Amino acid sequence: MKKNFFIITAVVCGMSCTTTAYAQFKIGGKKINVNKVVQAGTDAVKAISLSDADIAAMSKEYMEWMDTHNPLTKPDTDYGKRLEKLTGNIKEVDGLKVNFGVYEVIDVNAFACGDGSVRICAGLMDIMTDDEVMAVVGHEIGHVIHTDSKDAMKNAYLRSAVKNAAGAASSTVSKLSDSELGAMAEALAGAQYSQKQETEADDYGFEFCIKNNLDPYAMYNALNKLLELSAEAPKESKFQKMFSSHPDTAKRVARAKEKACLLYTSPSPRDISGSR
């Protein structure tokens, strides 16, 4: 597997994150330095209004850019075959048409975008079981269903230098250039979901597992693995810092385990055959 690194929405400030240093990160052979990106002023940010249509178009452009600048695995690879086995029968989730892909990068990460694109890093697939991978997928789809991803995309656009280059003084959003999409990727990499959003996404991931007849403990196991990884990571690493800044992660792990336990201790256990 190629040692590529990529910037994506910070999907877990508790769920999944990279163990590698972003200083090594390159896109298309070029290092991205957000400090060199021109920032528009506060007044310009307030002046921009983004519609749902703008966000949808932006999400599509963003995913096309991400798939171009990251090594998307082919169907005949081990990762491609495993992905097909896990997601081949999932075409739509709660009205959202979804498509899946694997980036052959070593990051332990995954994310979903507002256009229904779900991308999983090979690094995450390497350390997790099939059910755990799907729990993470359910969590990420939950962020989209709850509009967390759409809000993150909007906020990243407003915070990034994209707004300056794309016309901060204009009331409309123009098609984004390659450099502007790179700047947005930087902004999305620094995005963080609230604890409430993460907990709700955990719940969605849990229900996703139940609906698809997967291990009810998969969400707990996935979260617990990530928590253990953070404990093993170097003290000053980005991975460790991310988890240390979210002390409630351990509570999320415990909560996920409790939900799975309750499924079996309830007087009328739920049928986990996939019907609801």
How would you name each of these model-derived features?
Residues 9-16:
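Bacterial N-terminal signal peptides
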Residues 14, 224, 273-275:
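N-terminal processing/targeting junctions
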Residues 264-276:
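Single conserved hydrophobic/aromatic residue that forms the stacking wall/gate
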Residues 8-9, 273:
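Residues marking helix boundaries in flexible regions
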Residues 1-7:
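Bacterial N-terminal signal peptides that target proteins for export
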Residues 20-266:
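A Zn2+-metalloprotease active-site environment signal
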Residues 1, 13, 270-272:
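Intrinsic disorder/low-complexity segments
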